[in-house]
Structures are given as structure tokens and as C-alpha cells.
């Protein structure tokens, strides 16, 4: 089944956590459950949480086709992470179905596949922009563990490697300007 909120109590708790975090200035939230963003978007529209809160669907939710991606956009998500091993033609079909940004993993920790997709990145940009590239995951042995200072340096190296591939194979690609992502 994957990560999901179990029961209405967990929905309420997650909404309260978003309210509290937003009072502390947090504006970006990663969600795992399809029901939660539906309610969070309604709360955002009603003014119960700030209108500039950004909700992103986790790759763990299994978004892997245009219909599920469109559903995510319809329920108020601001961006989606499709499954990590999504094929390029599938990614292209998702882009045709939604207007929201897509977050795409360029690599993964060994515990969730351990693959590296750096040479696919230029094509990902061509077919799926606007996209956010999620790079550096291969450095982590497992998903969602704390990052050491050394792993942070290695993650930065992975970012530089992806940037080199983009510069070499798609030099006309445009990056978001610094500060353009406000959440």
C-alpha cells in the first residue's frame, strides 16, 4: 500500500502540523497521501493556512501515468514527484496532462534502486519542463536518513556532474533564476 495516512485522525494531525509549521514560516510541504492535499488545498483557499503554501506529492505515492498526475493537480498539488524509475515516454505523457512542475530524481539511493540517470537529464528537460531535478540521492545508502558533512560534499559533486551533462548535451536549457522559488 505504501505510505498513507490511516484514518481521519491522521488527516487532522497532518493538517494541524501544516498549520503549526506555516506559523513558523514554512511554506513547502511534501505529502504522501492523496486525501491530505485535497483538504489542505481547501484550507488554503479558505485562508486557514497561508495562500503561498506549496504542496508537493512524494514519489512514494506512485504517480506513474497521466491520469494519476492530472488527479494530483486537480486536488490542489503544486508539483509532483513521479515514480523514480519512470521512463521518458511516460514522463512526456505526464507533462502533456499537467501544467504543474514535475520533480524528477536523477539518481537514487541503493535502498530504492541505486540507479543513475544523468545522461537522460537533458531529454527529461526537453520533454517535461518545467521540472525540478532531484540530485545527490545515490550518495545516501538508504532513503530518508540523516546526511553527514561528507555526504553533503558528495551530493554537491553529483549536482556538478548533472550540471556538466546539461551544459554538454543541452546548453540551451534554462534554469530558474535565483530566488524564483519562493516556498
Predicted regions and their residues:
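Active-site pocket-lining/capping segments in soluble small-molecule metabolic enzymes
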Residues: 1-26, 30-63, 81-82, 88-183
Amino acid at each position: 500500500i505504501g505510505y498513507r495516512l490511516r484514518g481521519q485522525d491522521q488527516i487532522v494531525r497532518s493538517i494541524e502540523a501544516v498549520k503549526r509549521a506555516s506559523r513558523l514560516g514554512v511554506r513547502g510541504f511534501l505529502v504522501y497521501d492523496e486525501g491530505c492535499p485535497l483538504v489542505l488545498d481547501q484550507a488554503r483557499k479558505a485562508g486557514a493556512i497561508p495562500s503561498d503554501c506549496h504542496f508537493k506529492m512524494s514519489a512514494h505515492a506512485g504517480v506513474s501515468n497521466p491520469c494519476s498526475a492530472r488527479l494530483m493537480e486537480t486536488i490542489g498539488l503544486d508539483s509532483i514527484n513521479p515514480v523514480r524509475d519512470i521512463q521518458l515516454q511516460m514522463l512526456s505523457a505526464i507533462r502533456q496532462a499537467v501544467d504543474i512542475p514535475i520533480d524528477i530524481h536523477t539518481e537514487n539511493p541503493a535502498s530504492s534502486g541505486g540507479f543513475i540517470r544523468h545522461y537522460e537529464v537533458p531529454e527529461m528537460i526537453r520533454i517535461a519542463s518545467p521540472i525540478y531535478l532531484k540530485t545527490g540521492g545515490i550518495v545516501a545508502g538508504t532513503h530518508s536518513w540523516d546526511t553527514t558533512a561528507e555526504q553533503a560534499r558528495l551530493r554537491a559533486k553529483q549536482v556538478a556532474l548533472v550540471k556538466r551533462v546539461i551544459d554538454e548535451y543541452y546548453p540551451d536549457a534554462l534554469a530558474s533564476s535565483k530566488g524564483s522559488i519562493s516556498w
